[in-house]
């Protein structure tokens, strides 16, 4: 059995849950649902939901931090 040795992201992660953000400045809006699983290179994948379609997928924690809040 493989053990995950990656630290959990910043405790401020809880503040992201429920946030509505966009992919870059002009991208589609998405809602951050929560932590999903470890990703590549020390990153984590977060569960997100596309606002317009309801589709759920995973997205990089680092990218979420860089994406702007939806207006």
Enumerate the predicted regions with their spans:
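Mixed-charge, Lys/Arg-rich low-complexity intrinsically disordered regions
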Residues: 1-19
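Serine/threonine-rich, low-complexity intrinsically disordered segments
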Residues: 5-7, 22-24, 59
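A short beta-strand micro-motif
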Residues: 19-24, 48
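Short acidic/polar mixed-charge low-complexity motifs
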Residues: 26-29, 53-55
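Short beta-strand-centered aromatic/proline hotspots
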Residues: 28-36
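A generic structural motif
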Residues: 36-39, 52
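Short aromatic-glycine-enriched beta-strand elements
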Residues: 42-47
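Intrinsically disordered, low-complexity, charged/polar segments
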Residues: 51-71
């Amino acid at each position: 059995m493989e053990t995950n040795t990656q630290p959990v992201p910043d405790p401020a992660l809880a503040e992201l849950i429920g946030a509505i953000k966009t992919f870059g400045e002009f991208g589609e809006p998405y809602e951050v649902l929560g932590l999903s699983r470890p990703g590549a290179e020390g990153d984590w994948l977060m569960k997100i939901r596309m606002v317009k379609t309801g589709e759920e997928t995973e997205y990089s924690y680092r990218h979420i931090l860089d994406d702007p809040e939806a207006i």
